[in-house]
């Protein structure tokens, strides 16, 4: 039986040899490996350091070819030998343990010109009658490139046919080492090597040894792992397939297999996609060309190589915010503070939980953030922090959210204490001027605030920090410090200016501001003996010193000091001489005399809780207009009800409905009685105010009309004086009564 198999091998080798000589190429050969038909693990071809792709066809394993005088584009079937499988007989009928692993093959950088040749392999088995089972031994294939090949173990291997082509020799060997006393065969190794001089086969493992001593470094290796299974059916076995998983050898394998790393497989995993490119149905009404283009870009240029998760899972997978890929696929993860700092413990894992709660965007409760002058947190969320100590400071006490307004209360109380209420207000006094600069408080209040400074910093120290004191490298601030200070200053001065009050005695003409109401030549109230309150100041009574009542009416008041001299005023601020214009403050006097509140509110106690004891003129007009509009609408509704109402009938149901309608109507009248009285009262007040101010308004309009003529005459007199001075310099004398022609021709208005 063994002789018959050797004969069949020789015939098949001679046929293959003849075909290879006829074709003139070391072209593609078909590796015919008998194996199981189903149920076993397919062979794997391992590639290290190179591309792995499913390149196996239905015909076998196409190897790289070296074309000599042939057309590369021709069909590959012409270069494949016709292996006769009819002479094969099934020898083993039981299973055999598969080959666990082979030592990795080494491929040197010799004179191998991408030409390899594979011959038909057949199994050479020795029938052992002493074993109950005849295992099929694993085959060993050694593809060598060189000028000659040596065999050292088995002298019968030299008798095997060889197929030389283009100076290359290919050796196909089979080893069968059954021992009569052994129960299991010993598999031989498989190695693919290239050398400049040749190769030698030693023992059960064929190793490549350079004869010239010029073996290059290992560049790539190709390993063919073919598990041996019993074959009961004559024919081709499963085709080897490319597999990206590394295969390691057994106990006595070489060290090259152990040097296989996982990153090599991952390196090529991003190049070879595991799915087909997107090909949507373009005839479908749901086809979106933009979506197809985006999918094609994602398929061609993947940003995250490796296994891709679905979008609904990928958006919830935590990622490293520092080592995140920067690309167009950052919709799921972003390096912005709004998305990466949601969990502060991920960014600062070594921080204690108490400090982690002080991070920006960690939650609504941020007890230890530094405050800008306006109370805005220093960081609105950002990674560019100077140090971790800047994020945390001394924790504030509970209820410290309103600490800013609590800091303002001492200043407000101090201003309330020092402002004079029962005596004339001196707008030009040294105390007021000093208060404008530094806002000092009386001595008791200063001592009180000094005692409070030990347990709570003052509002000025907490809100007035310069830009140099704030240590921060973040360029994105909520508001610039300068603008914040200006806004704080405006609000602070506005709260102080509202404390200027007018007592209730002002209604009776006993104002502490002592407004002059004498008759005489009058002009615009713009002299140096007058002062103008800020536009936001409110004229209020002494009953409400703490409430804020914005006044839109500019009140011109005249304040006299103890010496009877005028102080701060608009004309003095402009540098205009006080004797140039003569004024009479009749308008401010009359405006200050009219009552802004209801007459019944004069004798009441001071109100608290922010209620307004006195109302300004503008607020009174607004209130009157709103109430009048409401009253008119209600009267229209009442007219509609009364017009559509019907008289009561004699039956009981009609009487009940009429009685119910009467009760509702009476109740509605009672509810709107107060509205009616308020409209009447405020209307009378406004009418009285208009009547009192009618002559004042007429006087003001007449003065405005006369001002143009007065200014023109003053300009003419100034021009005459200039001409007189020029004439005196020139030595000419003019008649004193003579006036310039321009002044004579110009009409005099208002004289």
Curated annotation (Swiss-Prot):
Native organism: Pongo abelii
Gene coding for it: CEP68
One of the GO biological process terms: centrosome cycle
GO cellular component terms listed in the entry, alphabetical order: centrosome; cytoplasm
Gene3D superfamilies to which the protein is assigned, alphabetical: 1.20.58.60
Summary of the function given for this chain in its UniProt record: Involved in maintenance of centrosome cohesion, probably as part of a linker structure which prevents centrosome splitting. Required for localization of CDK5RAP2 to the centrosome during interphase. Contributes to CROCC/rootletin filament formation.
Compositionally biased region (Polar residues): 131-144, 163-175, 339-348, 451-461
Compositionally biased tracts (Low complexity): 176-200, 520-537
Region feature (Disordered): 1-253, 339-474, 511-545, 590-611
Modifications after synthesis and translation: Phosphorylation by PLK1 is required for binding to BTRC in prometaphase. Phosphorylated directly or indirectly by NEK2. NEK2-mediated phosphorylation promotes CEP68 dissociation from the centrosome and its degradation at the onset of mitosis.
Protein name: Centrosomal protein of 68 kDa
């Amino acid at each position: 039986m063994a002789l018959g198999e050797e004969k069949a091998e020789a015939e098949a080798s001679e046929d293959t040899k003849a075909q290879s000589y006829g074709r003139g190429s070391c072209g593609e050969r078909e590796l015919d490996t008998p194996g199981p038909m189903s149920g076993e693990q397919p062979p794997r071809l391992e590639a290290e350091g190179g591309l792995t792709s499913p390149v196996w066809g239905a015909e076998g394993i196409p190897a790289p070819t070296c074309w000599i005088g042939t057309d590369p584009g021709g069909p590959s079937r012409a270069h494949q030998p016709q292996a006769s499988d009819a002479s094969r007989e099934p020898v083993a009928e039981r299973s055999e343990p598969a080959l666990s692993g082979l030592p990795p093959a080494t491929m040197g950088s010799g004179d191998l010109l991408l030409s390899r040749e594979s011959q038909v392999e057949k199994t050479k088995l020795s029938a052992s009658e002493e074993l109950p089972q005849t295992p099929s031994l694993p085959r060993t294939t050694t593809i060598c490139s060189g000028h000659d090949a040596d065999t050292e173990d088995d002298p019968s291997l030299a008798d095997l046919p060889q197929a030389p082509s283009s100076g290359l020799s290919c050796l196909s060997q089979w080893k069968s080492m059954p021992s009569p006393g052994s129960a299991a065969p010993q598999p031989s190794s498989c190695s693919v090597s290239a050398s400049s001089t040749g190769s030698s086969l030693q023992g059960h493992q064929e190793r490549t040894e350079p004869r010239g001593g010029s073996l290059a470094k290992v560049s790539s290796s190709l390993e063919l792992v073919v598990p041996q299974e019993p074959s009961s059916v004559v024919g081709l076995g499963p085709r080897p397939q490319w597999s990206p998983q590394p295969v390691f050898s057994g106990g006595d394998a070489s060290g090259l297999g152990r040097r296989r790393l996982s990153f090599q497989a991952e390196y090529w995993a991003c190049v070879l996609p595991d799915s087909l490119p997107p090909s949507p149905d373009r005839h479908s009404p749901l086809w979106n060309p933009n979506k197809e283009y985006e999918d094609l870009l994602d398929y061609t240029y993947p940003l995250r190589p490796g296994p891709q998760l679905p979008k609904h899972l990928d958006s919830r997978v935590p990622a490293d915010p520092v080592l995140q890929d920067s690309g167009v696929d950052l919709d799921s993860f972003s390096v912005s503070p709004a998305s990466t700092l949601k969990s502060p413990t991920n960014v600062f894992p070594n921080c204690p939980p108490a400090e982690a709660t002080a991070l920006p965007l960690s939650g609504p409760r941020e007890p230890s953030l530094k405050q800008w002058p306006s109370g805005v947190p220093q960081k609105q969320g950002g990674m560019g922090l100077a140090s971790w100590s800047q994020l945390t400071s001394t924790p504030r006490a509970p209820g410290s959210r309103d600490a800013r307004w609590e800091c303002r209360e001492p200043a407000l109380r101090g201003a309330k204490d020092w402002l004079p209420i029962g005596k004339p207000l001196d707008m030009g006094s040294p105390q007021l001027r000093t208060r404008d600069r530094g806002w000092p408080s009386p001595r008791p209040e200063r001592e009180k605030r000094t005692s409070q400074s030990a347990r709570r910093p003052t509002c000025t120290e907490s809100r007035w920090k310069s830009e140099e004191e704030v240590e921060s490298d973040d360029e994105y601030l909520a508001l610039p410090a300068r603008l914040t200070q200006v806004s704080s200053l405006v609000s602070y001065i506005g709260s102080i200016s509202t404390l200027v009050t007018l007592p209730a005695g002002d209604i009776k003409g006993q104002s502490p501001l002592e407004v002059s109401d004498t008759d005489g030549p009058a002009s615009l109230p713009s002299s140096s003996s007058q002062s103008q309150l800020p536009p936001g100041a409110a004229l209020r009574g002494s009953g409400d010193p703490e409430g804020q009542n914005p006044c839109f009416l500019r009140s011109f008041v005249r304040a006299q000091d103890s010496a009877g001299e005028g102080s701060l005023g608009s004309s003095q601020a402009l540098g205009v001489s006080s004797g140039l214009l003569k004024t009479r403050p009749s308008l401010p006097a009359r405006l200050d005399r009219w009552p802004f509140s209801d007459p019944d509110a004069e004798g009441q106690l001071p109100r608290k809780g922010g209620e307004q004891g006195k109302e300004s003129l503008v607020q009174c007009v607004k209130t009157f207009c709103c109430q009048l509009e409401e009253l008119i609408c209600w009267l229209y509704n009442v007219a509609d009800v009364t017009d559509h109402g019907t008289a009561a009938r004699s039956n009981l149901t009609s009487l009940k409905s009429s009685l119910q309608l009467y009760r509702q109507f009476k109740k509605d009248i009672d509810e709107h009685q107060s509205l009616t009285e308020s409209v009447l009262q405020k209307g009378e007040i406004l009418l009285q105010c208009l009547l009192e101010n009618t002559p004042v308004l007429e006087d003001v309009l007449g003065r405005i009309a006369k001002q143009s003529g007065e200014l023109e005459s003053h300009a003419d007199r100034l021009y005459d004086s200039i001409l007189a001075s020029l004439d005196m310099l020139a030595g000419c004398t003019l008649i004193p009564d003579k006036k310039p022609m321009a002044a004579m021709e110009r009409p005099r208005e208002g004289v």
